[in-house]
Amino acid sequence: MAAIRKKLVIVGDGACGKTCLLIVFSKDQFPEVYVPTVFENYVADIEVDSKQVELALWDTAGQEDYDRLRPLSYPDTDVILMCFSIDSPDSLENIPEKWTPEVKHFCPNVPIILVGNKKDLRNDEHTRRELQKMKQEPVKPEEGRDMANRINAFGYLECSAKTKEGVREVFEMATRAALQAKKRGKKNACALL
């Protein structure tokens, strides 16, 4: 039986861990050096609920320089991974300020999974010290859940690409969301306006 094809687009602030999450999931290796993304595509096979799904993973650049290029990724998207970094409260703030309006404009009705990346840094001493200098602290799980409710996300998950904790669960939830969206009719596909 042929695999069902679904398209996943990942968005979020620059350096919040999007590319690492995709690479760890699709290639099972953690990239040690940071290279800002312009436009990358990966394909990964995943099985959920005894369905074979071929997931086209579309990486995007979070930097503002790419705000005009990013919408080229959106047409025909089945599910969005909207990411922030647990060690960056500012990246969580950009979820309702920047990412939700952009995604809901180009992809109305496409399910959104809110993902807290870099979970391993929540209890990291160096991270905590650096954030304290700015009178901040790592994002708490309940803050992520509250944000997911606020933006009407399909779900909220936390993961660490570095330790691989929670990575598979993110893509399983995303695949389930994409499969469910199909049942509501193909009218949900993203439009390029």
Curated annotation (Swiss-Prot):
Domain of life according to the entry: Eukaryota
Post-translational modification: (Microbial infection) Glycosylated at Tyr-34 by Yersinia ruckeri toxin Afp18. Mono-O-GlcNAcylation by Afp18 inhibits RhoA activation by guanine nucleotide exchange factors and blocks RhoA signaling.
A GO biological-process term: actin filament organization
S-geranylgeranyl cysteine-type lipidated residues: C190
Residues listed as glycosylation sites in the UniProt record: Y34
Keyword match GTP-binding: yes
Positions of GTP binding: 12-19, 30-37, 59-63, 117-120, 160-162
Official protein name in the record: Rho-related GTP-binding protein RhoA-A
Gene coding for it: rhoaa
